[in-house]
C-alpha cells in the first residue's frame, strides 16, 4: 500500500492532484507531506530547476506573475499560465515547474561572442528592447563581440559570422543583399559589389556577404596585367573605362594590383626583351591616343624591353637581325613606295613590288614597309659542278659552272626534270644505290632506293673509259656524242640517250638499260635453235667477240647510236645466218664439221674463196671478230638419246683400246722385272757362299787362340785371387782393432760425461734445497715478526692467558672442584684435561720435521 507520508528533500518539489477539485498544486521541500485520501501525488520528489551563472533555460507555457513577481492563481487555486508563450530564465534561485509548464530547452550556457565575431539576429515579432529601439518582425541586425549574448524570446539567431582577415596585397569582394549602408557609410543597392582593401579583420554588415577573397597580382618589371572593363566605370586612377575597353597595368602604376569588381583579368603579360642583335615587328600597334592602329606595323629594334599592349601581337616572334657575310645576301621586296639607299649610299625610290638584293657584309633590320623574301648564299662551284639559273624576267635558263656565284634579284634556281629511268641510272653511276656497273645493267623501272637528287644542280655524268654517250638537245634539235673518259654536263634543254639492250640467253629485248655505249672489245652469248636437213633440231650456245669501229670524224660519231639495240639486232642477224647454213647439211655432217660450218656462215668468204676474219655491220660500225661454240644440245629427246648412246659407245671403244695397251705394257714390264730379280738372286747366293767360307776360317783361328790363352789366364787369375784374399785379411784385422779402440774410448767418454752430469745435478738440487729452506725460514721469521708487531705485546699476553682462564671459569660454572677417572694403563696429561672435559679438540703438535 502506498505510503501517505512523502518526505520532500530541500530544493525538491512534487505535484499533488486534488481529486475532488481536479486541481494540481505544488509542494516544495523541505518538509514531510501527508497525503489525504482525496489527493494523489503525480510524481515522486523531483529536483528543482537550477540555473547556474552565465546559463539560461527556456520554459514553455510559463505561469503568470503579478507586479511583485508572485504567481497568480485563479479562483479554483490553479496557477494561471501564459499558454504558447516562452519565458527565458537566467541565473536565479532554484524554482519548481508549475503544472502546465514545460522545460523546452534545458539549462544551456549563454553564448559568448568573441572579438571579430558577430551573431546575425532576426526579429520573430514586433517588439521594443530595453533601449527603446523598435523592431519589426523580419528585421535583422548584428550582435558584435566581444560580449555575452542574452537570448530573447522575440529574437532568433540566424548564423554566426566570422570576420574575414584581409592581408597585405589582398582584398575582399562584398555584395549587398539589400539596400544598406556599408561600414564607410556609402549607400549600396541590392546586388551591388565592391572591394574592401583595408588590411585587418573585416566583419561584414548584416546585409553584406563575402563573395571572394581577391589576391593582388604582384607586378614586376617583367610582368604586367592585361585588364578588360565589364562595364563603364571610373578606376582608382580616375580614368573612365568603357565596357569592353582593354588596357595594361604595369609596375610603374602599381607594384601590387587588385582588380576592381568591374575589371576582368585577361592574362598576365610577360615582358618582351630584345637583345642587341634582335628585332620584332608589332602588328596593330597602339597609337598615342591609346587606340590600336589596325593594319599598321611597327618595327622595334633591340636592345629594348617593352610590354605588348592589348591588341598588339608579334608578326613572327622575336627575330634575329640579319648578319650577312661577304658571300651572303638578302632578297628584299618593297610593300609600298619608300625611300632607300643603295650600296653606294645613293638615295633611291623603291616602288611597291620592287625587288633588290642587299649584299653583305652588313647588319640589316628590314623596316615595316619591306619584306624579306629569301636569304641567299653564294654557291661555290668546282670545275665539274654547275647550277641551273633562270632569269625571271626573260625566262631564259642557263648553266653556271666553275665559279662562286650568287643569284641576282632577277634570278632564281631552276629545277631540271629527268625521266625516272635516267634518275636511276645516274644514281647507280654516282654509287647512291646498290647497283652493279655504272649504267651497264639496270632494271627497267625506277628503284625505290634512289636518293633524291638536287634538281637545281647541273646534271653530270662520268663517261667511262672506252665508252660513248649521246646527248640530245631538244631545243636545238641536234645531238652530240662524247667519248670517254670525259665528264658530261647537261644543258637546260639536253637529255641523255638511254640505250635499251637485249640480254639473257636467249636474248630478251629491253633487258638492260644503259646511258653509255661500250665500244669493246667485248663478247655476248646467245642460244640459237637450228634444224638440219634430216630434221634434227639442235640448240647451240654461241659466244661472239665484238667491238665498234670509231670514226675519226666527230660528226660521224652519231652512227654509233643509229641502232638502239645493237646486241639484239646483231644476235638476230648472226642466228639467221647460222640457221640458214645448218639447214642445208645433215646431222652427221654438222656433227663432224660444226665449227667450219658456223664460222663460214657467220663470216662468209671473200672473192678469193678464203674465210673472212670478221663481220662488219655498216649502219653502226659493229665488228664481230670471232665465234665460239660453247655447247651443242639436241632439242628432240630421241636425237639426244641416240647421240648420247653413240658418244657412250665411242667412249667405250676408246676406253677398251686404252685398257689393252695398258695391259700389254704392264705384262712387258712385269717380265723384265722378273728377269732382273732372278739375276740378282743368283748374284746374292754367290756372295753369300764366299762370305760363309771366310767365316769358317775365322772361327778356326779363334778356337786356337782361345785354347792357348785359357790356361794362362786361369793361372794368373788364381795367383791374383790369393794375393787379394791375403791383403783383405790384413786390412780386416787392422780395421777390427781400430773399431775396438774407438768403442772403448767412446764408452769411457760417455761414462765420464754421465758422472759429471750427475754431480752437477746433485749439486744443483742441494743448492736449490738450501735456498728453499733458507727462504722458508726467512718467510716464517718475517711472518712471526709481522704478526707480533701487528698484535702487540698486550694482545699476545691476553691470548696466552685466555685459554686457561676460560677453562677454569667453565669448571667453576659446572660446580666441579676436581674429578679424575682413569686406570693405571693410561697415562695422564693434565695439561689437556680441561680442554678434553669441554669437548675441545687437542691442538696438533708442531711437526719436528
Curated annotation (Swiss-Prot):
Pfam families: MVP_shoulder (PF11978), Vault (PF01505), Vault_2 (PF17794), Vault_3 (PF17795), Vault_4 (PF17796). MVP repeats lie at residues 2-54, 55-109, 110-162, 163-215, 216-270, 271-321, 322-378, 379-458, 459-521. The keyword Ribonucleoprotein applies. Transmembrane segments: none annotated. CDD domains: MVP_shoulder. Its main location: cytoplasm. It comes from the Eukaryota. InterPro entries: Band_7/SPFH_dom_sf, MVP, MVP_rep_dom, MVP_rep_sf, MVP_shoulder, Vault_2, Vault_2_sf, Vault_3. PROSITE patterns: MVP. GO terms for cellular component: cytoplasm; nucleus; ribonucleoprotein complex. It is found in: Cytoplasm; Nucleus. Keywords: Cytoplasm, Nucleus, Repeat, Ribonucleoprotein. Required for normal vault structure. Vaults are multi-subunit structures that may act as scaffolds for proteins involved in signal transduction. Vaults may also play a role in nucleo-cytoplasmic transport. The vault ribonucleoprotein particle is a huge (400 A x 670 A) cage structure of 12.9 MDa. It consists of a dimer of half-vaults, with each half-vault comprising 39 identical major vault protein (MVP) chains, PARP4 and one or more vault RNAs (vRNAs). This is Major vault protein. The gene is MVP.
